[in-house]
């Protein structure tokens, strides 16, 4: 008979990975209080000899989606939570079934409560700054070092969920409306422009293509080109045909309105003002691919990490999920990619465990 112990953790976390009081119960509606998360975070990794099956870098929609499945698979997993998620300034979340109009913060809090039901999950509230191969191990493991340098962790598999960082305008009062009157994603918040005066802030590249995405909601669109970018003749002709107004060579310096997200005016450098109800900005972003680069993962021309259908990168045992691997920036896609990576890793771990057990007979 095969002696099969795939569920063993390698650290003291109980025999099942689920609190005994919850075995056999529906855990979907459990509400774990913040104290539980705090205790787990304070119980950071004390023994560097512990080898986790999976290290997840990033605790947004994709990272936590992967974590909850790995918890249910009883896999010893560590999550590195480096701080705010991309949409942490948004007031409401849209397009995610069951969470319409809830806040991203509420969603993340609920996601954490789901994840932290599983004792095989550990949390480190630090940013990972370095990943390298474990030179003392022949099993292709990874060493992860955090910003403080105090936490060095070993893992068999990596899920990188570091996402992207949006470029935001340096405009007076912008912060007051960011996520509440001013947004960047048409698919997430374009509905908010319905039959309203829309101002689009952009540096120019792909401007008209971006503006066209809103025509299903509003035809009252003014595009403000920031900086010195010159539109192509085709863009100008398309804009004129579609009734999209263009303001050039006159950067926005101020947004006026009420603190409740009610925008009233766009004020430009030359003193002119324009009526507006809603702002969308398209100023580019930075792909947070530094760790993927360290590992030698192949990137595309825009800096996104290339992945297979299972979210695996071009480097063995390294997966990339969420906004890091695609320009389809939508929370449903992010969560789905995390689940795909978790399932793929679990299947490979199980396959390897069965193979090793049989070879020992």
Residue ranges and their predicted role:
Residues 109, 115-147, 152-155, 218-304, ...:
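A Rossmann-like FAD-binding core segment of flavoenzymes
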Residues 66, 89, 133, 169-171, ...:
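Short glycine-/acidic-enriched loop or helix-start segments at secondary-structure transitions
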Residues 210, 324-361:
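A conserved FAD-binding loop/helix module that cradles the flavin
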Residues 180-187, 200-210, 232:
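Active-site glycine-rich loop that binds ribose-phosphate moieties when present
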Residues 52-109, 202-229:
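Beta1-alpha1 glycine-rich phosphate/pyrophosphate-binding loop at the start
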Residues 161-163, 168-170, 201, 282-283, ...:
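Short, well-ordered coil/turn residues at beta-beta hairpins
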Residues 2-55, 122-196, 269, 278, ...:
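FAD-binding core/adjacent interface of flavoenzyme oxidoreductases
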Residues 176-192, 283-330, 340, 347:
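FAD-site-proximal beta/loop scaffold in flavoenzymes
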């Amino acid at each position: 008979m095969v002696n099969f112990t795939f569920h063993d953790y390698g650290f003291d976390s109980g025999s099942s990975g689920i609190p005994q009081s919850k075995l056999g119960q529906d855990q979907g509606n459990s509400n774990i209080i913040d104290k539980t998360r705090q205790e787990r975070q304070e119980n950071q990794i004390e023994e560097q000899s512990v080898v986790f099956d999976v290290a997840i870098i990033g605790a947004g929609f994709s990272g936590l989606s992967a974590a909850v499945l790995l918890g249910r698979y009883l896999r010893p997993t560590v999550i590195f939570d480096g701080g705010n998620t991309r949409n942490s300034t948004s007031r409401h979340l849209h397009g995610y079934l069951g969470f319409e109009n809830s806040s991203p913060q509420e969603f993340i809090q609920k996601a954490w409560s789901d994840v932290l039901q599983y004792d095989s999950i550990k949390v480190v509230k630090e940013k990972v700054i370095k990943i390298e191969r474990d030179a003392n191990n022949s099993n292709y493991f990874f060493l992860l070092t955090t910003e403080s340098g105090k936490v060095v962790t070993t893992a068999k598999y990596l899920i990188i969920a570091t996402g992207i960082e949006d470029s935001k305008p340096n405009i007076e009062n912008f912060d007051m409306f960011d996520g509440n009157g001013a947004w960047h994603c048409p698919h997430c918040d374009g509905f908010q422009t319905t039959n309203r005066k829309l101002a689009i802030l952009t540096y120019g590249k792909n401007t008209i293509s971006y503006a066209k995405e809103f025509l299903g909601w509003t035809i009252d669109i003014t595009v403000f080109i920031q900086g010195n970018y010159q539109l192509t003749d085709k863009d100008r002709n398309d804009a004129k045909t579609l009734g999209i107004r263009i303001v050039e060579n006159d950067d926005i310096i101020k947004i006026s309105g009420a603190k409740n997200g009610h925008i009233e005016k766009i004020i430009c450098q030359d003193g002119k003002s324009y009526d507006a109800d809603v702002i969308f900005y398209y100023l580019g972003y930075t792909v947070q691919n530094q760790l993927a680069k360290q590992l030698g993962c192949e990137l595309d021309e825009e800096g996104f990490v290339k992945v297979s259908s299972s979210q695996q990168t071009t480097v063995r045992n390294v997966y990339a999920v969420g906004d890091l691997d695609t320009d389809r920036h939508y929370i449903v896609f992010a969560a789905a990619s995390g689940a795909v990576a978790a399932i793929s890793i679990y299947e490979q771990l199980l396959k390897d465990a069965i193979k090793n057990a049989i070879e020992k007979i």
